[in-house]
């Protein structure tokens, strides 16, 4: 193909686009008129059966481009629906009665996963400045304390590690219980080999730690031929070593755990990668908001049809919302059905953002705002 031929074809596409843009604008204007009619007559925005019938008909008429047409018109319908929500859901930002204001400086009672000296303990102390902290051995116990005991205002647990991935059990607790994220913090993970006085790298034959910490230090463990034993947390491992008082056992934990349980740091920084950090979240029984909140976490499910996820994500793009994480998780109730976890930058006090979330909630069977919170960077203190 000659360069002149390519230029001619591109010019033809440009001419087609020039015709499409006015038609797109006209379609959106008409959609606005439909929204006003629906608002005046108390009609719902979303009519799933009608949209499916129209989409199927338009796709079939596209012949060999059926699949492409389905994505195109599906996206157009989603954008039109979003525009209609702007008209009908005109109440503005999130209603005040649906959220509480979060203030980490106030005295509070916190349920924390693990033991004194664990990374979760470091996270809790970094988030809350005047907290009474109580520790629990499992994620379920920590969540249960917050849910069932009114003495607790918050709970702190890990949700993601930069090398080991998401802590799926915590995400499951979030979706299956009335729990909401109110703060997030990223803590650098500097794993140390801890032991009693007199212990050395050469003397330690068995190492205790949480399963994720063992995974993150797998190269060091393998190189030294150590046996691995899982504990509920890194701090629990340190406590066990302090109780056994044996130079042949060691724990993988933090320097704080060493000082907490009277152990020595045999070697510092034994993790596989130096760029290792864990993201922790503070949870509450109520959805919160704050002026400096910069991240929103949601979870939802979609019909198992081609293009549904793409179309959903396109609505975030249309508002200029930056997605920072998306992950799928199998639904317990359905075979080959999935929940999607999504993080994006934003604040629900922004009117357009709240309208989008309200629209998605109305259109999806399973939808939950997990939280709107400030997500702090790596804490080096």
Stretches with model-predicted labels:
Residues 1-381:
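Domain-level signature for soluble enzymes in the chorismate/prephenate branch of the shikimate pathway
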């Amino acid at each position: 193909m000659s360069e002149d031929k390519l230029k001619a074809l591109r010019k033809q596409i440009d001419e087609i686009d020039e015709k499409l843009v006015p038609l797109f604008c006209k379609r959106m204007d008409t959609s606005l008129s439909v929204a006003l009619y629906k608002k005046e007559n108390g009609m719902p925005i979303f009519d799933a059966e009608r949209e499916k019938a129209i989409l199927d008909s338009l796709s079939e008429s596209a012949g060999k481009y059926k699949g492409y047409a389905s994505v195109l018109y599906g996206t157009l319908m989603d954008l039109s629906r979003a525009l209609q929500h702007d008209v009908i859901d005109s109440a503005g930002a999130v209603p005040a009665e649906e959220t509480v204001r979060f203030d980490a400086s106030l005295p509070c009672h916190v349920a924390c996963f693990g033991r004194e000296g664990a990374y979760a303990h470091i996270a809790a102390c970094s988030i809350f400045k005047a907290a009474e902290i109580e520790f629990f051995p499992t994620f379920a116990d920590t969540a249960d304390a917050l849910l069932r005991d009114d003495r607790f205002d918050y709970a702190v647990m890990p949700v993601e590690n930069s090398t080991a991935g998401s802590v799926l059990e915590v995400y499951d607790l979030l979706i299956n219980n009335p729990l909401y994220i109110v703060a997030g913090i990223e803590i650098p993970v500097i794993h140390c080999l801890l032991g009693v006085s007199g212990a050395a790298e050469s003397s330690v034959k068995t190492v205790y730690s949480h399963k994720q910490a063992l995974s993150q230090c797998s190269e060091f463990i393998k190189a030294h031929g150590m046996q691995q034993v899982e504990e509920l947390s890194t701090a629990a491992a340190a406590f066990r070593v302090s109780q056994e008082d044996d130079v042949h056992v060691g724990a993988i934990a933090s320097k704080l755990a060493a000082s907490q349980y009277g152990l020595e740091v045999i070697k510092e920084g034994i993790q596989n990668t130096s760029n290792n950090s864990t993201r922790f979240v503070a949870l509450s029984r109520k959805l919160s908001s704050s002026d400096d909140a910069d991240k929103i976490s949601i979870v939802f499910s979609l019909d198992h049809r081609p293009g549904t996820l793409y179309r959903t994500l396109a609505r975030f793009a249309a508002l200029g919302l930056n997605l920072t994480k998306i992950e799928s998780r199998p639904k317990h109730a359905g075979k080959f059905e999935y929940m999607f976890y999504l993080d994006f930058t934003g604040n629900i006090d922004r009117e357009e953002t709240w309208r989008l979330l309200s629209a998605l909630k109305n259109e999806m069977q399973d939808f939950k705002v997990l939280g709107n919170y400030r997500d702090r960077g790596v804490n080096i203190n």
